[in-house]
Amino acid sequence: MTARFQKVASVFAAGMLLAGAALAASGDAALTAVTGVTVIPMDAERTLPNQTVLIAEGRIVAMGETGTVTLPAGAERIDGAGRYLMPGLADMHAHVYGYDLAEQETQDLSEVQAQLIGYAATGVTLLRDAAGTPGHFLYRERVAAGDWIGPDLFLASPIFEGERNVWDFTVKVTDPVAVEPLVAGYAEAGYWGLKIYHTVSPDVFDAIMTSAQAHNLPVMGHVPFDVGIDATLESGITSIEHLRGYDFDGVPVASLWADGGRSRERFSSWNRMTPERRDELVSKTVAAGVWNVPTLAVNRMLFDPAARAAVIEHPRFARLLPAMQEGMKSMEGLDAIFSVDSRDALGEAYPVMLEFIKALSDAGAGLMTGTDSGVPGYVPGFTVIDEIQTFGDAGLTPFQALQASTIAPARYLGIADDRGTVAVGKRAGLVLLDSNPLEDLSALWDLSGVFLNGHWHSLADLEAAMDEQSTMAAE
């Protein structure tokens, strides 16, 4: 899958670069230029001051010191003086509301549009949905066509679960023979990869990994309870979500299954992990080339009222759909999933999890930002910035934390030739900020606007779109 993505991205980028050069030469007015801006290219820890960046047909077609780049007459100009242009952010674990294709005929999709706008309004230009449905392909098409405002979507399959499934919307598989037809169907449908849950049995897990390899589909997900972290790291899985699975040591199987797999005893195991075991797990993770999407910012929402209050008090929160606001304020859905004991245990384990992230980073393991947003109570977009700041809290430098939301996801997806840095030929999924996030990660909140596939959306435009969706929902 990775090799195929890289080949397609390389050929497409080359073709679009030539097309962009032709547009610039002809003076076509369908060009946008950001002038006098400081570029944070994210190819190295550096800034490029006083740059002009020229965008056409969704690509960066020219970039250089202001005054050296010829701007065609009629090109739209955006004043970048005193501002910073960087790659757009990525949410590598999200849940956009999904429906079956047949259901979409009767569903109001304004809530979906509101979600996607919410991501864009916090600088998210790429999103990996961790539980795809057939309906998500329609959303992806509408975003790609420019009909909807939102990030580019990479869709994982519907979630594979086992006998003791947690969710009723997942695909329950107990017979390994049933796996291959499902995987073949997901590959044919165009899903990016497969998603597994901790309830999958060892024989079904093995069948999933075998079929995934045969169809060139990456596998992401939770570590199955009956497989364990060591075997999972050796299986070919590409990313582990929420750090789930590193916390199995010394926990009886019955305790792992308690509270839907979210027991106090399980989360408390973080505080019993020895430095030697931590180093062993980190080394195995690096050796296997497995990435992690920790989603720690959302864990903090569960045990830290201040974290939840910070989101609710943010000026942009009032622009969300009323249902989203109420979900965040009440956290009713999550209260039914995480017991008070398990939330307390998460709070006690949180500092150790931060240390684990730092150990992974120091060892060179792949880290990416994700939010689990779309789950009741988690607000689209907001938590991406919180997660980046959480990486900073773990001891990563601002540049390292930003990498986890820009070039790192592009490398993981095999599209680093196409995205993840600011350079000529790259896709123009970009964020324009009023201050420098390399100095302070909170600068990510100082959004001036975002380029989605080369289309400019100012913050005012994005907020107006959010207001429109909220008004429609209230009618």
Which role does the model predict for each range below?
Residues 39-52, 65-68, 379, 397-402, ...:
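Acidic, glycine-enriched loop/beta-strand segments at the rims
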Residues 9-21:
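Bacterial N-terminal signal peptides
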Residues 22-27:
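Boundary at the C-terminal end of the N-terminal hydrophobic targeting segment
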Residues 36, 83, 93-97, 222, ...:
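Histidine-centered divalent metal-coordination motifs
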Residues 182-195, 200, 249-394, 467-470:
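Active-site neighborhoods of metal-dependent hydrolases
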Residues 84-145, 163-166, 171, 177, ...:
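Metal-associated gating/positioning segment near the N- to mid-region
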Residues 28, 39, 44-86:
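Histidine-rich, glycine-flanked metal-binding segment
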Residues 115-134, 151-158, 185-199, 218-220, ...:
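Divalent metal-dependent hydrolysis catalytic cores, especially in the metallo-beta-lactamase
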